[in-house]
Amino acid sequence: MSSRPVRVGIVDSGINPRDRQVVAVEGGVGIRFRDGRVERDSSWEDLLGHGTAVAATIRGHAPAASLFSIRVFHRRLEAHMEAVLDAIDWGVEQRLDLLNLSLGCTNREKEAAFVSACARAMDLGVTVVSAAGTSVESSFIAVAADSELEGEEIRFEPGLLRASPWARPRGVLPREKNFHGTSLAVAHVTGIAARLLSRGERSLREALSRMSSGR
């Protein structure tokens, strides 16, 4: 089966399209919640570096993927939930295949809206890969970090995938000095999922669980 370009949206601090590991970005959007309303603009490039590290890690697993920057982090790695929900909607509008949400949601008051938005996206054909929240949900592929895992390794648990917390190696920079943690674990799973989709895989959850290093 011939491969097809997989469209991946990265909800984060933006992406630097000139980064040598990222190679290219198809486009994107900047999203803010300000003065009680959501605003969209063209400011999707990264000023913080986090989203670029995520994009580079995804690119390492899926070199042919089409990457889209959905910037919700601006001056710091924080975002209003309304901006995150709109980011998910934007991914649906653009008919993306995958949405990478390294941020997740640990606020129980806002979690219901987040889970609902993810479920809607999944129903409309956009697979959401996100940091695990406060409960196990089937509305997205939930990911947590495991420092014992490396690169392609995945560990399957009921309702949860564990992956490496380390970013794609960058020259002589020690990995502990680069961004690391659950955000990068999510990126590893998203990148592997993109590669599986490009090969025609239809059931991502099953395919990812089969890759589990514990099986």
What are these language model-derived features?
Residues 40-107, 190, 199, 210-214:
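Subtilisin-like peptidase catalytic core
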Residues 11-14, 70-74, 101-105, 131-133, ...:
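Active-site-proximal beta-strand/loop segments in catalytic clefts of secreted hydrolases
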Residues 73-138, 177-187:
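Substrate-binding/access-modulating region of protease and related hydrolase catalytic domains
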Residues 1-61, 65, 86, 170:
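Active-site core segment of subtilase-fold serine proteases
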Residues 19-21, 110-111, 152-153:
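Short glycine-/acidic-enriched loop or helix-start segments at secondary-structure transitions
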Residues 7, 66, 125-127, 139-141:
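Proline-centered loop/turn at the N-terminus of a beta-strand
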Residues 12, 135-198:
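Extracellular S/T/G-rich loop segment that most often corresponds to the catalytic His/Ser-adjacent loop
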